[in-house]
């Protein structure tokens, strides 16, 4: 009978520690998000993440269309 209680307590402790670990690992990202929200920082725009030579997406798209138009169909 004591073994069943010991097993139940062990499983409860295991579940509680798992939830605590998940909660405490979430805290740093929450704190960072709150700090950036308070300071008013905005996320960078998508275009700022690309190198300057890659900014002209439409021109590259037209170049690919021209390239594929000249390729033979198999």
From Swiss-Prot:
Residue ranges of the TM segments: none
Entry keyword set: Amidation, Antibiotic, Antimicrobial, Cleavage on pair of basic residues, Membrane, Secreted, Signal, Target cell membrane, Target membrane
Gene Ontology biological process terms, A to Z: defense response to bacterium
Family statement: Belongs to the non-disulfide-bridged peptide (NDBP) superfamily. Short antimicrobial peptide (group 4) family.
Lysine amide carried by residues: 39
GO terms under cellular component: extracellular region; membrane; other organism cell membrane
Subcellular location field: Secreted; Target cell membrane
Name used for this protein in its record: Imcroporin
Domain of life: Eukaryota
Signal peptide: 1-22
Propeptide: 45-74
Chief place of localization: secreted
């Amino acid at each position: 009978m004591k073994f069943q209680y010991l097993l139940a307590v062990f499983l409860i402790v295991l579940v509680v520690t798992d939830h605590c670990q998940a909660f405490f690992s979430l805290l740093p990202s929450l704190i960072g998000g709150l700090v950036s929200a308070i300071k008013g920082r905005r996320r960078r725009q998508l275009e700022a993440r690309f190198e300057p030579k890659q900014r002209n997406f439409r021109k590259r798209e037209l170049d690919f269309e021209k390239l594929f138009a000249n390729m033979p169909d198999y």
